[in-house]
Amino acid sequence: MSGHSKWHTIRRTKGVNDQRRGQLFTKLARDITIATREGGSGDPDLNFRLRLAIEKARANNMPNENIQRAIDRGLGKSNEAALEEIFYEGYGPGGVAILIEAATDNRNRTNSEVRATFNKNGGNPGEPGSVSWMFEQKGLITIDLSAVKHDPDELQLMAIDAGADDVVVDDETLEIYCDWTQLNAIRQALLDQGVPVANAEKIMRAKTLIQPDEKDALAALRLIEKLEDLDDVQKVYSNLDITAELVARFDA
C-alpha cells in the first residue's frame, strides 16, 4: 500500500477506534450540505458532487435521516446557520506546502483554530495564493484491488482508455487521477465494465512532491494530523511525499 493510501487508512481506523464517529458524521454532513448548495439541487441524479458525497456517507454507515437533514440545510430548509467553504494555506516543517479545505458557520472561529494549530506545531499560516499555485484540481477514483477480478495492468489500460491522466498502482489500491470534469464519465465507464469503485471525489493534488529529512517530515505529518482533527476542516492537502516508511515511523 502506498504511503498516502496507508496514511488515510490509518486515519479512518483511528477515527473509529477513538470513537470519533460523531466528528466523521459532521464532516460528511457538511460535504453533503456544501455539495447541495453548490450544485443547486438536492437530487443526486442531477447533482454529481452530491451523489459522491452521499455515497461516501453511506459507505461510512451514516443514517439516512442525517443525510436528508444535511441536504435540507444546503437547500436552506433548516434553521441551522449557513455554511461557507473556505481554503486556508500555509507551510509546515521542512517547507511542506499545506492547503486546507474547511466548511464553517463561523469564519472567525475557524480562522483562529487553523492559525493556532499551525503556530503550535511548527508551521506558518500563509496568505491566500501562497501555496495554492502548487496544487491543481483533479478527480480521484480509488479502486480496492482485493475487490476486483481484473489485474492491475488491465485496470490501468481501462482507466487510460476512459480518459485518465495518471494511474498509481500499489499492492492494495489503484488510484486514478483525471480532470475533475471527466470524473463522472470515467467512473461510469469503469462501473459499466464491472469494476467496483471504492471512492470517487474531487481533490487538490500537489504538482510535485518534496522529501524533507525524517525529523521535518514526521513533524509535518503531525501538523497535518492536528489540522485534520479540527471540527471545521474537511480535507488537508500537502506536497509531502508520504512514503510507506514514513507512515510506519509515524505510527510506531
From Swiss-Prot:
Compartments where found: Cytoplasm
CC per GO annotation: cytosol
Disordered as annotated region, ranges: 1-22
Keywords: Cytoplasm, DNA-binding, Transcription, Transcription regulation
Compositional bias annotation for Basic residues: 1-14
One GO molecular-function entry: DNA binding
Protein name: Probable transcriptional regulatory protein Caur_1043
Species for this entry: Chloroflexus aurantiacus (strain ATCC 29366 / DSM 635 / J-10-fl)
